[in-house]
């Protein structure tokens, strides 16, 4: 399986979705874009790295921070992405950072049938 990159931020019940996503599939590596609260309070497995960013900064600054934190980590030409948790601004910043890195994107989610590409 490829690397997974997901937002871990706001939204009622979204942490449960992200946790299920991590446990339902075997990923090579998992990067969760979160804030300090998420880094301190979300339980992860050994393949997961929590990348804490300042979610309150402007869109371009957030994009640049995410880009900086991911640029030396992604090893493949394609990544799986989940955007269930977080805000539109966080999603735009993550997508822009990934496109700036030049990687392909597969949107994935947990459905009633398990983890699927959507």
Sequence positions of predicted segments:
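Long, low-complexity, Lys/Arg-enriched
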Residues: 1-80, 89-118
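Conserved TIR/SEFIR loop-to-helix hotspot centered on a Trp-containing motif
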Residues: 86
């Amino acid at each position: 399986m490829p690397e997974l990159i997901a937002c871990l931020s706001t939204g009622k019940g979204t942490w449960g979705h992200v946790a299920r996503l991590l446990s339902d599939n075997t990923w090579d590596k998992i990067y969760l874009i979160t804030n300090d609260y998420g880094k301190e309070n979300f339980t992860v497995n050994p393949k997961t790295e929590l990348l804490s960013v300042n979610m309150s900064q402007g869109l371009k600054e957030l994009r640049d921070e995410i880009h900086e934190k991911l640029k030396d980590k992604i090893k493949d030409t394609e990544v799986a992405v989940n955007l269930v948790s977080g805000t539109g601004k966080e999603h735009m910043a993550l997508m822009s950072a990934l496109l700036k890195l030049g990687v392909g994107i597969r949107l994935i989610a947990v459905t009633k049938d398990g983890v699927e590409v959507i």
